[in-house]
């Protein structure tokens, strides 16, 4: 942010300009005001990712060890597929054993930026050493935060829950008071110790660490709704206001900020919720987890979430977490991650088409090829060429050199309109 304010372009900024529909002046202005943030893998600076208004929307894919399953082989299979099928950012949400070993290997394996939630490491260590995930010391919070940045994390996430927010949650009529894992861990710690959130108490130190390492900070909403009944309620808005105040402090220290919020939400509330979050947090890049548009989509959560994501992105969100069909049930397998990413790529492209001038060029090209029945070009221009070609082999026309697909056959509109008069 400091470089952008001085009008200088970094190597990462130059690479962003090569891949995004934005000019140098707009990029520098966006970064200097906090409306655009750049994430980089500190071990591989060749693939920086820009988040913010005027840029293409991005997909974040969660990964990491779990207390239920810590198979490195399966986790790295998911990482490989995530990178292959369109994820722009990985988020290490490790809460199982060997997280340090896993993160080191992850950082050297992928070229994607890696976000994290350091609090999960504190909880796992407390559980392993003390038999209680809440039994950690406030000084451990800052130590782990700094440790993960030094290891190469691109953007650490913190939960800004406070004593006042906890009171508001517990006096509210929420159907599901707590659903954020990190928010709940920190809330339980605050209630047990009667101390304020160490992230808030040490916020200036947190910002100094981020500024020194040129790493943006992510706020992970502690009060996000876990059901439609609680979506976009006063509790959540109170947290957004707090985040807005903290964003101002961060920007004064030249620290870029991202906010990750909005869970379950009815379709009619998504536009106003995104607008509210953007306004309260000074138009910084925002991400959404879904939003899930129904609480009843068990087994098909990727569909529910991708519908919500399309609406949220079109209305101003900048990235979304890829939720799989296994959400709310269990850990995804690689095939679930691939399925989700394919759906999100289509959804986000559709939303970006309506927001960013010039992106429709490839859609126009495939339409021209379709009109001419140029099958090879159509298949190559598809968002997922491999799937398009596999589908063509399975159900496409027997004689592709003849016009028409296998749906209309000889009644193909493109064929009929070109038929010479003498045929009749």
What does each model-found stretch correspond to?
Residues 2-300, 305-319, 393-395, 399, ...:
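Alpha/beta enzyme core
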Residues 17, 44, 326, 419-420:
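Residue-level detector of alpha-helical segments with a strong bias toward transmembrane helices
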Residues 168-193, 225-231, 255, 331-424:
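Catalytic or ion-coupling anion/metal-binding cores of large enzyme and transporter domains
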Residues 296-299, 304-305, 312-357:
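C-terminal catalytic subdomain
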